[in-house]
Amino acid sequence: ISTGDIFRANLKNGTDLGKQAQSFMDRGELVPDSVTNEMVRDRLGNSDAANGFLLDGFPRNTNQAQVLDQILADKKMPLDAVLELKIDNAEIIKRLSGRRACRGCGGTSHVEFEKPKIVGVCDKCQGALYQREDDKEEVIARRLEIYAEQTEPIITFYNSKAVSYTHLRAHET
């Protein structure tokens, strides 16, 4: 379950939480915890999460980790493991800034790794491809700064708990 997907679904559906998140996402800033936590709580209430789930992009700070602990306690579910995928910042920027989304079907391609047959045109539906605001290089760079400031401390948080914590090099993924 990706927080990015949760945000985009809330935006597409015009929810109050989605509207609150929009301006932060466009600037590459983290959506405030109060909004993010509520979106995640709502999403984890769906039936497909009843027997377990894998979260992508959450928690991003110790406050969110504490809220996740409470959500799991309310659901009477354990936290089985934490995985951290590490990759060089230059590679992150290259991968994200080259990503293109389709205005028609929502599919994605990449200017280098998954080139469409016709530049700027989706292979699936022939819709127009565009670069999302949060995939622009300057926005990605800001997101990486925020990651270093706010997300890295949760490594300490989870290392202090009896939770399996695994660090994986993700450069070949």
Predicted segments with their positions:
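Hydrophobic/aromatic beta-strand patches that form the interior of the parallel beta-sheet core
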Residues: 1, 81-83, 165
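ATP-dependent small-molecule kinase phosphotransfer cores
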Residues: 1-77, 88-91, 101, 132
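A glycine- and Lys/Arg-enriched "phosphate-lid" helix/loop adjacent to the NTP-binding pocket
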Residues: 23-24, 73-149
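Residue-level preference for the first positions of well-ordered beta-strands
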Residues: 51-52, 163-165
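S-adenosyl-L-methionine-dependent methyltransferase catalytic core, i.e., the SAM/SAH-binding region
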Residues: 100, 152, 162-163
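Major-groove DNA-recognition helix of helix-turn-helix-type DNA-binding domains
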Residues: 158
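Conserved small/polar residues in nucleotide/adenosyl-binding loops
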Residues: 166-173
